[in-house]
C-alpha cells in the first residue's frame, strides 16, 4: 500500500492536534511523561501564585508572574501538540486501514472439500480452525491458509499493488489475508486467527501510536531524563534557603521568588527532548508504514537501527531472480539432446521461472514439445529445501535435477558414480557466476543445465554504504560455493552462506548472536519461520506463508526483499533523531543558565552581572525570554522530530562527530541568539 505522506502542519491534522493537546492536559495523561509533568505542576503553581497576587494576598508583579505561567502552559501544550500531531498522522493511516475492513459474509464448510455442505455465517463469527469456501467476487473473511484450489486475488486494499496475485494450496504462496477479494476461481481456506487478531486488525493496532509500548531505549532515555530532572529539582529547591540566607547576611537585595525558581527549573530540565520523545517514537512507526512495512512494535523499529549483520537472500534481493536456462552441458557419453529431453521432462510440472525456462530452451534447441504428465502416467517430485532437488518418475525412468551435492548423494545412494568431468562443468558454470543445475537419470549423471543470474544494478554501491555504517552483509543462497563466491564478489557482499538449508541459516544467525551482533533477515516460506523467529529483525514478505508472517516482527506489504536495507535506514534514522534532539536539549541548558542565574541573584551578588554576557535588558526580561525560548524551541523542532534527522551512510564514529557538531554546538549557540532576540522584542514592546 503506498501510503500518502501527509504534510506535517496539514490544517485538518493541526485542528485535531490542537483539540487533542488540550485534552491531554488531564493529569492522568500528563503523569506518563515525568519531565513534562514537572512543567505541568509548575504551570499550576505559577498560575495559583498569579491569582494570589491579583487577589492582593501576595505581593509581586502580576504581569511577570502571569506571563511566566502563560508560557509554561504553552510549553506543556506544545509538547502535547507534538505528540498529538504524530498520533494524528498514525490515526489517519489507521482510519484508511479501517476503511478496508468491511462486514462480510462467509461460506462455512463442514469439511475441507469444495463440495462439502456449507453454511452462510458472518465473517466476525469465524474462529481459528474454521473452514470456508471463497469464490470469485467474494471478500476473504479471515486470514488463513489455502487447503484446496487456486485463485487470482486482488490484494490492492492491503498492499496498494493493483496487479492481482495467485494464491494456491501448497508452496510459499498459500496464505490469504482478510479484506482482500477473490477475482476468479475458488479457494478452500482454513482460518488461522480469531476475530480481532487478523493481519488487518494488527496493522490498525500497530499504527495507533497512542496504544504503543515504549521501547527499551526509550525507557532507558526516560530514566536518564527523570534522573536529570530530579538533580535539577533538588538543586533548584536548595536555592531558596540559600537566597534567604544570602539576603540576610549581605543586607542587600531580596530573596528569589518561587516563580523565578519554577522558571529556572523548567529551563534547566530537558523539556525539549522530554516533550518530543513520544512523538519521535510514534513518527518512526509512521515512517515505517510509509515505506509499506508494518512493524509489530516500536521495539522492532528500534532493533532495526541497531542491526549490524544483514542476511540477504540472493534471489530477488541481490540478483534479479527469474534465473534463465542458457545452456545444456552434457556429461561424457551423453548427447545434448538426451540431456535436454530429460531436463524438460523433469521440469514439465515445475512452475518456477527456472523450470519454465528449461522447458522453453529445450523447445528452442531441439524442437521438443511439451508432453502431458498425466498421459505419460508420470509422478512429479516437488522441490524441497531438505532434498534440494525435484524431478519426475515416468515409464521406469527416475529423473532428478538439483544442486550438485544433492544429485551426487542421490546418484551414489543408487550405486552410481559422479563423473569428474561433470565436476569440471559445474566449476566452469559457477566461475562465471551462473548456477549449475545437475540432471541425473537413475544412477547416471546426464549433465548440467547452466542458469544465468543477473546482479541488480546499483546493489554494489548500496552494500558499500552499509559497510561504511559498520553493517556486515551476508548473501544466503542454495547455490554451490563456487557460484556463490562469484556472485558475492560481483555484488560486493562481505560474506556468503552457500548450499543453505533452513538449519544452516538458523545456525548462522545463532552464531552471529553469540558474538553479540544483532541480525536482520527476510523470508517468505514456512521453512524460513525458525530463522525469522530467531532473528532480531525479521521482515516477512506479505506474499509469503502465514507461518512466516507470524514468525517475523515486520511484514513488507510490497514483498520486496531489498526493502530490508530501507528498514535498517529508517531504524537508524529514528535512533539518530532521538540522540540528536537529546544532545540539543541538554546543550540548551548552558545559555539558559547564563540568562537566569544573573537575573535571579545579581541584586544580592552584583558580581554575577559578569555572567550576563548576552547583555539582557532586565532580570524579568531575561527570565521571561528564557522561558519563551524554551517553549518555542519545541514548536520549531516538531518537523525534525516527525520527519527525522537527515541520514547519511557513514561509520558510527563519523555520525557521532557530525551530530555533536550540528546538534551539540547548535544546541549551545542557538539559545544565545534566540534568547537575545526575544529579549529585544520584549524590550521594544515594554514587556521587559
Curated annotation (Swiss-Prot):
ATP binds at residues 350, 354, 383-390, 401. The gene is kdpB. Belongs to the cation transport ATPase (P-type) (TC 3.A.3) family. Type IA subfamily. It is a multi-pass membrane protein. PANTHER family: POTASSIUM-TRANSPORTING ATPASE ATP-BINDING SUBUNIT. One of its GO terms (molecular function) is ATP binding. This is Potassium-transporting ATPase ATP-binding subunit. Keywords: ATP-binding, Cell inner membrane, Cell membrane, Ion transport, Magnesium, Membrane, Metal-binding, Nucleotide-binding, Phosphoprotein, Potassium, Potassium transport, Translocase, Transmembrane, Transmembrane helix, Transport. Mg(2+) binds at residues 524, 528. It is found in: Cell inner membrane. It catalyses: K(+)(out) + ATP + H2O = K(+)(in) + ADP + phosphate + H(+). It comes from the Bacteria. Disulfide bonds: none annotated. GO terms for biological process: potassium ion transmembrane transport. It is an enzyme of class 7 (translocase).
Amino acid at each position: 500500500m503506498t501510503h500518502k505522506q501527509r504534510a506535517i502542519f496539514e490544517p485538518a491534522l493541526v485542528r485535531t492536534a490542537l483539540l487533542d493537546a488540550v485534552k491531554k492536559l488531564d493529569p492522568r495523561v500528563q503523569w506518563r511523561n515525568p519531565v513534562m509533568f514537572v512543567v505541568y505542576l509548575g504551570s499550576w503553581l505559577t498560575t495559583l501564585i498569579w491569582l494570589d497576587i491579583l487577589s492582593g494576598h501576595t505581593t509581586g508583579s502580576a504581569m511577570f508572574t502571569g506571563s511566566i505561567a502563560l508560557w509554561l502552559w504553552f510549553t506543556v501544550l506544545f509538547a502535547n501538540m507534538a505528540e498529538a500531531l504524530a498520533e494524528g498522522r498514525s490515526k489517519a493511516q489507521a482510519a484508511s486501514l479501517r476503511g478496508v475492513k468491511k462486514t462480510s459474509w462467509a461460506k462455512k464448510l463442514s469439511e475441507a472439500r469444495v463440495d462439502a455442505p456449507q453454511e452462510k455465517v458472518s465473517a466476525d463469527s469465524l474462529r481459528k480452525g474454521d473452514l470456508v469456501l471463497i469464490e470469485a467476487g467474494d471478500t476473504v473473511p479471515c486470514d488463513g491458509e489455502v487447503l484446496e484450489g487456486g485463485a487470482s486475488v486482488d490484494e490492492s486494499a492491503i498492499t496498494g499493488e493493483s496487479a492481482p496475485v495467485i494464491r494456491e494450496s501448497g508452496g510459499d504462496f498459500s496464505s490469504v489475508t482478510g479484506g482482500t477479494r477473490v477475482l476468479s476461481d475458488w479457494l478452500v481456506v482454513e482460518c488461522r486467527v480469531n476475530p480481532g487478531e487478523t493481519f488487518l486488525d494488527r496493522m490498525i493496532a500497530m499504527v495507533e501510536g497512542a496504544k504503543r509500548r515504549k521501547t527499551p531505549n526509550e525507557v532507558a532515555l526516560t530514566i536518564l531524563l527523570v534522573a536529570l530532572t530530579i538533580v535539577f529539582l533538588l538543586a533548584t529547591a536548595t536555592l531558596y534557603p540559600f537566597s534567604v540566607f544570602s539576603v540576610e547576611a549581605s543586607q542587600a537585595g531580596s530573596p528569589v521568588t518561587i516563580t523565578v525558581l519554577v522558571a529556572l527549573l523548567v529551563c534547566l530540565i530537558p523539556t525539549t527532548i522530554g516533550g518530543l520523545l513520544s512523538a519521535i517514537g510514534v513518527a518512526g512507526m509512521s515512517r515505517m508504514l510509509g515505506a509499506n512495512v508494518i512493524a509489530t512494535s516500536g521495539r522492532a523499529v528500534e532493533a532495526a537501527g541497531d542491526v549490524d549483520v544483514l542476511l540477504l537472500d540472493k534471489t530477488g534481493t541481490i540478483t534479479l531472480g527469474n534465473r534463465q536456462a542458457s545452456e545444456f552441458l552434457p556429461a561424457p557419453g551423453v548427447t545434448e539432446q538426451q540431456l535436454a529431453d530429460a531436463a524438460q521432462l523433469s521440469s514439465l510440472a515445475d512452475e518456477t521461472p527456472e523450470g519454465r525456462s528449461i522447458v522453453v530452451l529445450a523447445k528452442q534447441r531441439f524442437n521438443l514439445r511439451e508432453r502431458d504428465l498425466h498421459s505419460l502416467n508420470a509422478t512429479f517430485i516437488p522441490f524441497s529445501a531438505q532434498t534440494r532437488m525435484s524431478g519426475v518418475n515416468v515409464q521406469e525412468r527416475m529423473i532428478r535435477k538439483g544442486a550438485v551435492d544433492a544429485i551426487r548423494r542421490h546418484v551414489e545412494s543408487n550405486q552410481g558414480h559422479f563423473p569428474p568431468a561433470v565436476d569440471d562443468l559445474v566449476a566452469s558454470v559457477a566461475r562465471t557466476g551462473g548456477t549449475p543445475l545437475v540432471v541425473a537419470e537413475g544412477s547416471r549423471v546426464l549433465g548440467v543445465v547452466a542458469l544465468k543470474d543477473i546482479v541488480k544494478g546499483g546493489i554494489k554501491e548500496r552494500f558499500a554504504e552499509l559497510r561504511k555504517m559498520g553493517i556486515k552483509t551476508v548473501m544466503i543462497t542454495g547455490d554451490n560455493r563456487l557460484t556463490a563466491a562469484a556472485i558475492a564478489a560481483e555484488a560486493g557482499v562481505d560474506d556468503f552462506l552457500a548450499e543453505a538449508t533452513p538449519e544452516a541459516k538458523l545456525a548462522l544467525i545463532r552464531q552471529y548472536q553469540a558474538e553479540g551482533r544483532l541480525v536482520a533477515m527476510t523470508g517468505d516460506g514456512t521453512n524460513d519461520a525458525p530463522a525469522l523467529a530467531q532473528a532480531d529483525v525479521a521482515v516477512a514478505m506479505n506474499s509469503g506463508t502465514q507461518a512466516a508472517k507470524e514468525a517475523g516482527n515486520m511484514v513488507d506489504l510490497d514483498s520486496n526483499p531489498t526493502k530490508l536495507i530501507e528498514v535498517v535506514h529508517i531504524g537508524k534514522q529514528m535512533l539518530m533523531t532521538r540522540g540528536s534532539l537529546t544532545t540539543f536539549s541538554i546543550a540548551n541548558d548552558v545559555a539558559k543558565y547564563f540568562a537566569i542565574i544573573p537575573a535571579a541573584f545579581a541584586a544580592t551578588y552584583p558580581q554575577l552581572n559578569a555572567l550576563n554576557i548576552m547583555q539582557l535588558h532586565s532580570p524579568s526580561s531575561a527570565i521571561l525570554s528564557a522561558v519563551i525560548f524554551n517553549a518555542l524551541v519545541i514548536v520549531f523542532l516538531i518537523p525534525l522530530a516527525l520527519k527525522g534527522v537527515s541520514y547519511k551512510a557513514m561509520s558510527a564514529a563519523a555520525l557521532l562527530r557530525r551530530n555533536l557538531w550540528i546538534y551539540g554546538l547548535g544546541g549551545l549557540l542557538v539559545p544565545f541568539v534566540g534568547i537575545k532576540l526575544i529579549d529585544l522584542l520584549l524590550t521594544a514592546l515594554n514587556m521587559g
